């Protein structure tokens, strides 16, 4: 079976974005926003050539090829994050007990969920903002992973254990992920 001697992926850098690469740490800046991430892999090299980021690996194995594509996707998400940002939308649903959802500090507090006396709490990751308007919860930020984790924390805080989710549909559910409707 022939073996590829070289695999390379290129990421185009937009005009209004600055990228710095030091020892496989990629720093992406634009308009006062900055994302920093370190990619540790022994065979993969990341460098900047003109207005492109080049990710390459010599004599790659299957996992090395996959990792090159993964790093490319992470860098694309970093560039999209500092230029556009990411937004997740969640909906508050209840049948009988009206929930009261509020933001205090770095937590989302869910009161009166299924008539419970003690509030449920969901952690907000650093660098993420949560806004509540009516039955909509909007989670925004520049780091896709932190925005997604915050939305998942909110959704998991209202999970009902031991009951059929087809019948008991109360909770807060993700309805749109980074521009894609679910």
From Swiss-Prot:
The keyword Iron does not apply. GO terms for molecular function: rRNA binding; structural constituent of ribosome. Pfam families: Ribosomal_L6. InterPro entries: Ribosomal_uL6-like, Ribosomal_uL6-like_a/b-dom_sf, Ribosomal_uL6_a/b-dom, Ribosomal_uL6_arc, Ribosomal_uL6_CS2. GO terms for biological process: cytoplasmic translation. GO terms for cellular component: cytosolic large ribosomal subunit. Gene3D superfamilies: Ribosomal protein L6, alpha-beta domain. Keywords: Ribonucleoprotein, Ribosomal protein, RNA-binding, rRNA-binding. Belongs to the universal ribosomal protein uL6 family. Part of the 50S ribosomal subunit. This protein binds to the 23S rRNA, and is important in its secondary structure. It is located near the subunit interface in the base of the L7/L12 stalk, and near the tRNA binding site of the peptidyltransferase center. This is Large ribosomal subunit protein uL6. It comes from Methanocaldococcus jannaschii (strain ATCC 43067 / DSM 2661 / JAL-1 / JCM 10045 / NBRC 100440). The lineage of its organism: Archaea, Methanobacteriati, Methanobacteriota, Methanomada group, Methanococci.
């Amino acid at each position: 079976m022939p073996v590829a001697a070289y695999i390379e992926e290129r990421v185009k850098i937009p005009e209004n974005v600055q990228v710095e690469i030091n020892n496989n740490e990629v720093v992406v800046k634009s308009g006062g926003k900055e994302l920093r991430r370190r990619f540790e892999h022994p065979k993969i090299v990341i460098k900047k050539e003109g207005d492109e980021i080049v990710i390459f690996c010599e004599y790659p194995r299957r996992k090395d090829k996959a990792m090159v594509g993964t790093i490319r996707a992470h860098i694309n998400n970093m560039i999209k994050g500092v230029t556009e940002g990411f937004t997740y939308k969640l909906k508050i649903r209840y049948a009988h007990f009206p929930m009261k959802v509020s933001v205090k500090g770095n937590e989302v507090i869910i009161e009166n969920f299924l008539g419970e006396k003690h509030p449920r709490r969901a952690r907000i990751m650093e660098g993420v903002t949560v806004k509540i308007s009516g039955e909509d919860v909007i989670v925004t930020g520049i780091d896709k992973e932190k925005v997604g984790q915050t939305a998942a924390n909110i959704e998991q805080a209202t999970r009902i254990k031991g009951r059929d989710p087809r019948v008991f549909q109360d909770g807060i559910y993700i309805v749109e992920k980074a521009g894609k409707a679910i």
